[in-house]
């Protein structure tokens, strides 16, 4: 059974983090909210109790997801133990995903070199490596990136597909197709 760690740092973007957790859990994918602390507060003052406190080891997970938000993304970027785990996942061929401003952590880890990625408008100016593409969701090998709060559902459905879940049933059941059409 696949297992996903959604990393929560103080100042994370609630829509991006909780949408991913909700959709993955609806798909019956094991998904833990892993925080730098037991309780974290999002960028819009929503407090969340994490499932697990980050101890520097995420090796029992198959995917790490980095939500955006500020200063949450900066906290992710600046945590050396997390950067080492991202690099380890990349070496092992495990999946990594980041949305909004969180690709700055992938950049800090040196994982965007020769990769296509997307992010929140303007954040690409902080990223020296990689090739920015203004798309809703970008997949390049084991890396998946997305733009921001309004793309969180599309991002989450892509992750479900990558992890072997039935994203189409979720899209239908959550009325995503009714609202956004068949091309999304």
Regions found by a protein language model. Name each.
Residues 1-92, 96, 105-108, 113-114, ...:
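Extended, subdomain-level signal for the structured scaffold at the beginning of enzyme domains
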Residues 117:
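Anionic-ligand binding patches
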Residues 121-125:
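Short, acidic/turn-prone active-site loops that include or flank metal/cofactor-
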Residues 137:
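Conserved catalytic-core motifs of GNAT/GCN5-like acyltransferases
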């Amino acid at each position: 059974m696949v297992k996903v760690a959604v990393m929560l740092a103080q100042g994370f973007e609630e829509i991006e983090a909780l949408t991913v957790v909700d959709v993955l859990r609806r798909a019956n994918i094991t998904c833990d909210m892993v925080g730098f602390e037991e309780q974290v507060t999002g960028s819009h003052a929503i407090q969340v109790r994490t499932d697990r406190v980050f101890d520097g080891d995420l090796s029992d997970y198959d995917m790490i997801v980095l939500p955006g938000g500020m200063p949450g993304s900066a906290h992710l970027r600046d945590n050396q133990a997390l950067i080492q785990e991202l690099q380890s996942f990349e070496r092992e061929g495990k999946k990594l995903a980041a949305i909004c401003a969180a690709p700055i952590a992938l950049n800090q880890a040196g994982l965007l070199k020769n990769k296509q990625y997307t992010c929140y408008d303007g954040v690409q100016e902080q990223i020296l490596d990689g090739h920015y593409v203004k798309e809703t969701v970008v997949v390049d090998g084991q890396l998946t990136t997305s733009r921001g709060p309004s793309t969180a559902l599309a991002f989450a459905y892509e992750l479900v597909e990558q992890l072997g879940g039935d994203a189409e049933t979720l899209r239908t059941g959550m009325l995503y197709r009714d609202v956004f059409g068949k091309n999304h």
